[in-house]
Structure formats: structure tokens, C-alpha cells
């Protein structure tokens, strides 16, 4: 029978000093022997997705105490990718993921905690905590802060729905008036919560449901809705139950590595492909799989992308649907239900509810279960009132969206496309693969041949786009922006937004060893691996080269001979794989990250071989 980890610091004569310190935190005599559960919060006033989390930790903690556990809260950092976007701050975003994973490990192991409730929300916080959960392998439940309500404003006598990406695109268009930009800016992000579309934050919170590590509704229930409170309370109660099952009944099925199996990672990736989620999820799932000891690779993602259809098109891929609409359509359980009916998920994986995924779908899929309370839960909707307060409204749609022909979530027969919303491309430009979010690409340019225009940094690319250097038919190549080359693998939302604002969104392609915001759409191909700084062929492209992109055949190639490619490689080997004429301040912390970082096909995790 597993022994409570916390017994190391709470039991025995030699731990009198540790117990004295525990007592100073408020523990009583009868608390020693109970599971100590870490409430891993990520509250910060810097991030709208986390600004409302200050009291959530104590909400969960109180429920843990009622259920018979001892709750101890601590905080992690949280970077807002939108605020860090477009300047040197973006270099710190991806490295913060690994810092979060390490800090959770440090706190939990230093204090011998028995279990965790992870209160996450935005882009790198959920992945960082997920990596830590897999690394630590103690009972863990995720509960996120929830998505923001979609912005709404009236322009030209028409009510439109929008988000922060709309604000970025409009602001870059010189033909748009200051008054219109101001109206959009003030309306784009109306409430607390993670940005309202299927960007990276919401994608990752949805994937925790598919992995089985969070409760149904976690990815889609609005941050502002009163019903979300029950998710926090239930997480507090359920984590104590998981502790009992593991520490008292030796039930290893409740552990993260038993839940996050290869099949569970396939379920998560299938969901991501079906909903056209952020391409960043590929990076984070690969990283989490490595922490879990699961051999999940780019080739597996490629295989899934060829058979899983795109069942939903959500902002930024359309302005018709946002996360509030996904919830109304049954949330992630609704999407997984459609994948199940198509025979595309594994139903025998475990979940934190202590049941199989199949059993969970029987209970929470609105198509197969007509329970009135379940449908009421998924009718929770937006209030349209600006607020930074959680649980501040109780508005509901009149009905759920169960239209699987033309609704927010489709069935396989009426899929938006029979191939999924993400694709992996291979070729001489990306021997280890690269990622494109096909859900955001107009099918007219799924096959694209263009002329390369090369930039050694995102800053140079932005200047080139805004300065008119980029023309119709160009493939914009931005290199030395990978995990090692950046360092930090910053997002390229500004270049893609500016291409759209210049009317080039369907007339150009963009290829980078960096990554893209979850808000990106268009023919934007990222994660080119190996990256330029690791000797990848993207570092050998020259202005004027012809690049062929073929999404249907999953290919991307530089149209030069093997002999010419080898000659260029030999020349670059002598010069060194570094950006030419780039001026960038790189801190010691970022240099450390870059030194250990692997390319994107490995999840940009640390290269453990360097420690041998």
C-alpha cells in the first residue's frame, strides 16, 4: 500500500521540527496523517485569464478541508502572451512553461505534498503544470479559470463578435479609422478569462478534458458564469477521493501517468485536430508526453490528422463561433461524443472522475443524454457585461445547440472537412516535420508555390511587411526564431496579422522555425524542424528560391537539387548556424534555455543528453 508522501515530514520523533513549522501554518494535531494537497494557483493581476483567480485557491482549499484533506496553496508565475507579443517580452513566454513545471516540482517535492489541484488558464501555465503533473505522478486534477466572453460591438449598424486578434489586424490597417480601432479595442476583451476563441489557452484547457485530467466543462464553461464555481468545488472534493483510492486502496489508475497514456494522448490530439485548435498544442502535448514517458511523436500526429475530420470551426478560424458557442453545443464532451460515434477515440482510458472515457461520455454527451440538469449546465451563456469578477452572472441560452448538421459542432457526415484542422508537413525544408493549422487556411491555397523572401528575425519580417517588401506570391521565411535560435521560440502573430491587414492573407505563405499564436490563421507554417540554429534546412533558404507547399500530400520542399542543398549546407557549416546581422539583447536566463532546448518536434523540452 502506498504511504502518504507527507508522512516523511509529519511522522516520527525526528520530524518534530518540521511538525512545529507545519503547526505554524495552521495545522492541528488531527491534521497529521491526512493527505496534504497542494493547491497550485496562478493568480496574477497582469493577465485577464488569471486576474479572477485570487480567491479560487481558497475556494478549492475549503472544499478539500471539508472532505478530509489538508490544503496548502502556492502560486506560479503566468505570462500573458498577448501583452508580451510584438516585443522582446515574447522571448520569455515558452521558457516560462518549463520554469512553471520546475517550480511546481520544487514546491511539491520540497514539502512532500500528496496530491495537487492545478488552477491554470492561459497559454503556458496549463502546459507547464501538465508537465509537472506527469513528472511528479501524484493524484492531480486540473481546473482552469475559464474562457472570456466574446467581444461584441456595433459597427456600420451591424453587431459583430470579435476578440483581441481583430484589434491587432484592424490596428495594422492604415485604411481603418482611429475611431473604429478604438471601438474594437474597447470591446474585444470584455471580461476576465482566457481569450474567447480557440486560441492556445482554451485549446489546452479543452485537451485536459480529453486527456481525462479535468472535469467535464472545464475547457468551455465561461469564467464569468456562476456554474463554473461548482467545477472548483467538485475538484476540491474529488482530489480527496483520488487520494483515498491511491493511498488507501492502492488504485494506481488515478495517477496522471495511468490517465495520460498513449491512447489518452491520441484522444487529446484527435480532439485538437477535430476542433482546429492552436498549433501550439502540438508543442505542449509532445512535451507532456515526454514527461509521462509516452512515446508520442510527430508521426503519430500526422497519422491522426489524415483520418480525423474537422468538426468545428471556431475563432480565429471564423468570427461566427467562440468558446461560449462551443459550450452551448455540449462542450468538449460534445466534440468527443461525435468522435466516438465516428469510431475515432479510445473509450477505455481513465479519467479523474474515476470512470472510463466511454462512461463519462454516456453521462455528459448532450446527444446521448437528455437529462434536464445536464442540458441546463450546457445552456450557461454570456451576460455581455464588462467585468473582472468570476461567477458574476447566471445567464442561459434558451436551448442547447444540438444541430450536428450546420451547428457549432458537426457530426462526421457533415464535417467541415473530412481531414482535420491540423496537419504535419515533411520535406527537405522540414525533415522532422512542421505544423500548419489547416482549419485557418482557405482551401484555395492548400497547394501553394511561391518565391522565398528571407528574414533573420520577426522584427525584420514585420518591417519588411509594413514597408511593402512582401508581395503577392511570396513565401515569407522567418528563421533563427526556434527554441534555440531565438532563443525562446516567440510567436509570429504580428507578421500574420499584418499580412492580413495588407490584403495578403490569401496571397502569401509564411514559414518559420518559430511558432504561432493560437490566434493565427492563414497559410502559416511553423515549428520547422530541425530549426535553423540546429542545422535545419530552413537556414539554407535564399531570397528568390522556389518553395512548394502541398497540404493535401503533407509536403513542403525547397525546389533545388540535392547537390545544391548539400553545397549550401557545407558552406553554412563553415560559417556557423547563426543569424546574420541580427541585433538582439539576450539575457543569461534565455541563454540557458536556448542552450538546453531541443527543436519543436521534440516539444522544445530540454536536451537531457547534454547532462550526461
From Swiss-Prot:
Homodimer. The gene is ilvD. The modification N6-carboxylysine is found at residue 124. HAMAP family: IlvD. One of its GO terms (cellular component) is cytosol. This is Dihydroxy-acid dehydratase. Its EC number is 4.2.1.9. Pathway: Amino-acid biosynthesis; L-isoleucine biosynthesis; L-isoleucine from 2-oxobutanoate: step 3/4; Amino-acid biosynthesis; L-valine biosynthesis; L-valine from pyruvate: step 3/4. InterPro entries: Dihydro-acid_dehy_C (IPR042096), DihydroxyA_deHydtase (IPR004404), DiOHA_6PGluconate_deHydtase_CS (IPR020558), ILV_EDD_C (IPR056740), ILV_EDD_N (IPR000581), IlvD/EDD_N (IPR037237). Its cofactor is [2Fe-2S] cluster; Mg(2+). Coiled coil: none annotated. The lineage of its organism: Bacteria, Pseudomonadati, Pseudomonadota, Gammaproteobacteria, Pasteurellales. Keywords: 2Fe-2S, Amino-acid biosynthesis, Branched-chain amino acid biosynthesis, Iron, Iron-sulfur, Lyase, Magnesium, Metal-binding. Binds 1 [2Fe-2S] cluster per subunit. This cluster acts as a Lewis acid cofactor. Belongs to the IlvD/Edd family. PANTHER family: D-XYLONATE DEHYDRATASE (PTHR43661), D-XYLONATE DEHYDRATASE YAGF-RELATED (PTHR43661:SF3). Mg(2+) binds at residues 81, 123-124, 491. The active site is at 517 (proton acceptor). Functions in the biosynthesis of branched-chain amino acids. Catalyzes the dehydration of (2R,3R)-2,3-dihydroxy-3-methylpentanoate (2,3-dihydroxy-3-methylvalerate) into 2-oxo-3-methylpentanoate (2-oxo-3-methylvalerate) and of (2R)-2,3-dihydroxy-3-methylbutanoate (2,3-dihydroxyisovalerate) into 2-oxo-3-methylbutanoate (2-oxoisovalerate), the penultimate precursor to L-isoleucine and L-valine, respectively. It comes from Haemophilus influenzae (strain PittEE). Gene3D superfamilies: IlvD/EDD C-terminal domain-like. It catalyses: (2R)-2,3-dihydroxy-3-methylbutanoate = 3-methyl-2-oxobutanoate + H2O; (2R,3R)-2,3-dihydroxy-3-methylpentanoate = (S)-3-methyl-2-oxopentanoate + H2O. [2Fe-2S] cluster binds at residues 122, 195. GO terms for molecular function: 2 iron, 2 sulfur cluster binding; dihydroxy-acid dehydratase activity; magnesium ion binding. It comes from the Bacteria.
